[in-house]
Amino acid sequence: MSLQHFIQDALSQWMKQKGPESDIVLSSRIRLARNLEHVRFPTQFSQEEAQAVLQQFEQKFASQEVKDIGNFVLIRMNETQPLAKRVLVEKHLISPNLAESRFGGCLLSENEEISVMLNEEDHIRIQCLFPGFQLANALKAANQIDDWIEEQVDYAFSEKRGYLTSCPTNVGTGIRASVMMHLPALALTRQMNRIIPAINQLGLVVRGIYGEGSEAIGNIFQISNQMTLGQSEEDIVDDLNSVTAQLIEQERSARKALYQTSKIELEDRVYRSLGILSNCRMIESKETAKCLSDVRLGIDLGIIKGLSSNILNELMILTQPGFLQQYSGGALEPNERDIKRAAIIRERLRLEMHRNGQEDETI
């Protein structure tokens, strides 16, 4: 299994499955930050130490099989082309920080559900991604990988402070739990302006689709815990579960109210966006995200028939700059990307509608 396996398809295997509450919660993620004992943190270590960490993981963990998960493949960042790294970021398999790391690496599971990032901000960052609202299952998988790694390496751990990490906000459990949520009705009714500060007061943080510093395009928000010290992993996940459940309820209520009070306006918005996606000859990524959000809402409310949310999940990744260029076989100028993006969207929508016997002659 090679790098090509991970960059050839827009959708990871786990993304093709429908999880609980998947019309609102797109994915659940658990990330565990760990460091090796007696090795300086990545912010301070030498090139030799960085390479030693990668070599250790290649010898002990690459090509190894884990029960119920499968084999892992090691990908070294310095051996990976910039375009391929960008695709891995767009698929959420690695972080933007890791992509920029000269001595970074990543152990990826065959189904792309689990990635173990090496020499990012910490020596080890275990990430588990599950479809829908499945934080408990993601935590269980992350702990399984954590135990597997700890059988063969010693972690930097303090009885007083817990797991030691480069960033003080990760000290303690080292856990970052997050959900990716599609909240168009709360955004359209401007309730997110009130909700975000309330979430922050609970010790949680709201970010965009690619985490810290990213914008919430396409009405997709990432909700995660902020502090990891003084709480157990279970308490942190329970807190996020509680807030997520409330957001699901509020989004459902807002969708219902919006459809009841502004049915024609909402249908117009949904079909107008479908019309743009079906007929555009050039389209930027931000407009694509906005239109995909509208169409997803239309599918979830039963306004649009003959399209599945899976095709939208695929288009979300497929129309990103990195994957577009990977799909096209090389680098593209911005206007060339906009033309290619429009062509791919039209092609995929026509294919999906035809497959479901709902051919739209305008596409």
UniProtKB/Swiss-Prot annotation:
InterPro entries: Arg_Kinase, ATP-guanido_PTrfase, ATP-guanido_PTrfase_AS, ATP-guanido_PTrfase_cat, Gln_synth/guanido_kin_cat_dom. Its EC number is 2.7.14.1. One of its GO terms (cellular component) is extracellular space. A motif (RDXXRA motif of the pArg binding pocket involved in allosteric regulation) lies at residues 337-342. One of its GO terms (biological process) is phosphocreatine biosynthetic process. Residues 24-254 form the Phosphagen kinase C-terminal domain. One of its GO terms (molecular function) is creatine kinase activity. Transmembrane segments: none annotated. It comes from the Bacteria. PROSITE patterns: PHOSPHAGEN_KINASE, PHOSPHAGEN_KINASE_C. Appears to be allosterically activated by the binding of pArg-containing polypeptides to the pArg-binding pocket localized in the C-terminal domain of McsB. PANTHER family: ARGININE KINASE 1-RELATED, ARGININE OR CREATINE KINASE. Catalyzes the specific phosphorylation of arginine residues in a large number of proteins. Is part of the bacterial stress response system. Protein arginine phosphorylation has a physiologically important role and is involved in the regulation of many critical cellular processes, such as protein homeostasis, motility, competence, and stringent and stress responses, by regulating gene expression and protein activity. This is Protein-arginine kinase. The lineage of its organism: Bacteria, Bacillati, Bacillota, Bacilli, Bacillales.
